[in-house]
Regions:
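Basic, polyanion-binding surface patches
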Residues: 1-169
């Protein structure tokens, strides 16, 4: 969030880095050599919130991919509901079943020839928010979450059949 404008965007390049301490990574491709609003806001504020997209909120979340100027909010455009965070100043999105409040650990410019091609962000999760309906005995119910992944372009994917394989001892 910058100057009272809450920025949002769907990113497919997001992953777990560590469970202890809980850390995640995000990668932001530059457009014509320019940083995206989201990464610029993360680097300046040193805080951000990551949400898990699910089958119920994916259409609204997709609207946040709109190419808006920095003074316009993708969150407002998508009619998503901001909710106050506990440990960071950046609000979260009420419609997400899981959200992670994060502090910036590292930012790294990568790739490109004359200018960087992307930024890699590593954030420490300082607060988890998980809906009670999908959380039991320290585990998230993947069926209840109904997570959706962003692939590329206009493509998203639902999680298919879930199966279990015992780990060797």
């Amino acid at each position: 969030m910058k100057d009272g404008v809450l920025n949002g965007a769907p990113f497919s390049y997001f992953n777990i880095v560590s469970s202890n301490p809980p850390m995640i990574s995000l990668s932001f491709q530059r457009s014509s050599g320019k940083q995206k609003d989201t990464v610029r806001n993360i680097i300046e504020s040193k805080q951000f919130v990551v949400h898990i997209v699910d089958e119920q909120n994916v259409k609204k979340i997709n609207k946040t991919a709109a190419n808006l100027p920095p003074e316009q909010s993708e969150i407002e455009l998508a009619t998503l509901t901001p909710v106050e965070s506990v440990k960071v100043s950046v609000p979260g999105i009420k419609e997400a079943k899981i959200r992670m409040e994060c502090s910036l650990e590292h930012s790294l410019e990568l790739g490109g020839t004359d200018t960087p091609g992307c930024e890699l962000i590593i954030g420490r999760v300082v607060q988890f928010h998980i809906e009670n309906d999908i959380y039991e005995n320290g585990r998230i119910d993947p069926r209840g979450l109904a997570a959706v992944s962003r692939l590329a372009g206009n493509n998203y994917a639902k999680i298919g059949e879930i199966f279990e394989i015992a780990r060797p001892k």
